[in-house]
């Protein structure tokens, strides 16, 4: 099964947490990309500060690695308040959430990552806390049990999720601000790589940064990870300068091609071409052919390949596109020309 150790995995890897923290932007002015989100948050934060209020509860959603945690920290910094961070799976009992809520000061930010994974019992405690700044606590057991209400200071809940569709309607409706993060353009990722290289003390040419950006799958976390690996290559095989040629050599050595595909992506596409004549093929047959789990194909591999137009989902199964054949220098089959997509290229319902 594929894990997050793939070089182009969007999920964080334990070894890079301290590095990511060092290069993470602290203010909205430093945040690159997502212009719509930045503009709206700038207005909402400025208005809240002008009134002396806490910011409305904010939900940030989108694919992993796009900067949801970074935005939560920026919101706290711009509001000049403290931030307490946790995640949905960690809050197993209502008491866990109650302990965090009662330790908040007025205006503080409570950041809950993977908020879609909150247990139902914990989520119910969150409703009155978000809406009325009150905490309902049960004291005693059996017939003697009674409920008391504790007043909470006005705080801002920032929730982050990669699966907004899994949020319950009552929870989603309690967020006054909802922001979706989109994949980054190559130009934006180039700026991010240039900035990160400067902070890491890497002598990077703009062409070298652009070469990394083109292969980063629209994701800053991947771009920064590739930057660190190319830096290593430049120090050992070059003179330490990050040029386009050095970046190309390093990423080719790491099997990340010009479209950001790695060996697992290419293995999946080639299995469809060589073993199933380009499709259509069912996902279970495909999983057996490459010895991977169905969920891995649907949740990890397919979304990017569909988004980039290398694969289609049709009513009869998965089909590789003309672009996939051309990527490998092969001639498309007749099935490619007649396939009707169930999911349009560039979208994924995984």
Swiss-Prot record:
Main enzyme class: hydrolase
Region span, Small ATPAse domain (RuvB-S): 185-255
Catalyzed reactions per annotation: ATP + H2O = ADP + phosphate + H(+)
Region (Large ATPase domain (RuvB-L)): 4-184
Sites where the protein binds DNA: 294, 313, 318
This enzyme's EC code(s): 3.6.4.-
Example GO biological process: DNA repair
Primary localization: cytoplasm
Localization annotation: Cytoplasm
CDD domains given in the database record: AAA (cd00009)
A GO CC term attached to the entry: cytoplasm
Binding residues for Mg(2+): 69
Binding locations of ATP: 23-24, 65, 68-70, 131-133, 174, 184, 221
Annotated keywords: ATP-binding, Cytoplasm, DNA damage, DNA recombination, DNA repair, DNA-binding, Hydrolase, Nucleotide-binding
InterPro entries named in the record: AAA+_ATPase (IPR003593), AAA_lid_4 (IPR041445), DNA_helicase_Holl-junc_RuvB (IPR004605), P-loop_NTPase (IPR027417), RuvB-like_N (IPR008824), RuvB_C (IPR008823), WH-like_DNA-bd_sf (IPR036388), WH_DNA-bd_sf (IPR036390)
Superkingdom of source: Bacteria
Subunit structure: Homohexamer. Forms an RuvA(8)-RuvB(12)-Holliday junction (HJ) complex. HJ DNA is sandwiched between 2 RuvA tetramers; dsDNA enters through RuvA and exits via RuvB. An RuvB hexamer assembles on each DNA strand where it exits the tetramer. Each RuvB hexamer is contacted by two RuvA subunits (via domain III) on 2 adjacent RuvB subunits; this complex drives branch migration. In the full resolvosome a probable DNA-RuvA(4)-RuvB(12)-RuvC(2) complex forms which resolves the HJ.
Domain notes: Has 3 domains, the large (RuvB-L) and small ATPase (RuvB-S) domains and the C-terminal head (RuvB-H) domain. The head domain binds DNA, while the ATPase domains jointly bind ATP, ADP or are empty depending on the state of the subunit in the translocation cycle. During a single DNA translocation step the structure of each domain remains the same, but their relative positions change.
Record-given protein name: Holliday junction branch migration complex subunit RuvB
Source organism of the structure: Chromohalobacter salexigens (strain ATCC BAA-138 / DSM 3043 / CIP 106854 / NCIMB 13768 / 1H11)
Record gene name: ruvB
């Amino acid at each position: 099964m594929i894990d997050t150790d793939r070089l182009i995995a969007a999920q964080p890897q334990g070894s890079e947490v301290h590095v990511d923290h060092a290069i993470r932007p602290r203010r909205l002015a430093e945040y690159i990309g997502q212009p719509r989100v930045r503009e709206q948050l700038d207005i909402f934060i400025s208005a809240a500060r002008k009134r002396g209020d806490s910011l409305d509860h904010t939900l940030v959603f989108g694919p992993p690695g796009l900067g949801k945690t970074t935005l939560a920290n920026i919101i706290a910094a711009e509001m000049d308040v403290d931030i307490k961070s946790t995640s949905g799976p960690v809050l197993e009992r209502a008491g866990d959430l109650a302990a965090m809520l009662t330790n908040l000061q007025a205006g503080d930010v409570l950041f809950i990552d993977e908020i879609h994974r909150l247990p139902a019992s914990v989520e119910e405690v969150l409703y009155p806390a978000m809406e009325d700044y009150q905490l309902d606590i049960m004291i005693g057991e059996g017939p003697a049990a009674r409920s008391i209400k504790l007043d909470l200071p006005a705080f801002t809940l920032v929730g982050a999720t990669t699966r907004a569709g899994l949020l319950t309607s009552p929870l989603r409706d309690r967020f006054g601000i909802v922001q979706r993060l989109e994949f980054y353009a190559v130009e934006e990722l180039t700026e991010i790589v240039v900035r990160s290289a400067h902070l890491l003390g890497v002598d990077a040419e703009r062409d070298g940064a652009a070469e990394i950006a083109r292969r980063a799958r629209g994701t800053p976390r991947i771009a920064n990870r590739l930057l660190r690996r190319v830096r290593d290559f430049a120090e050992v095989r070059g003179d330490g300068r990050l040029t386009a040629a050095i970046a190309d050599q390093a990423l080719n050595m790491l099997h990340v091609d010009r479209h950001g595909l790695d060996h697992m992506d290419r293995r999946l596409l080639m299995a469809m071409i060589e073993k199933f004549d380009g499709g259509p093929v069912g996902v279970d047959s495909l999983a057996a052919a490459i010895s991977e789990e169905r969920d891995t194909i649907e949740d990890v591999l397919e979304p990017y390949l569909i988004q980039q137009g290398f694969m289609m989902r049709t009513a009869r199964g998965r089909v590789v596109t003309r672009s996939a054949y051309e990527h490998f220098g092969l001639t498309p089959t007749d099935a490619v020309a007649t396939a009707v997509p169930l999911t349009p290229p560039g979208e994924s319902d995984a």
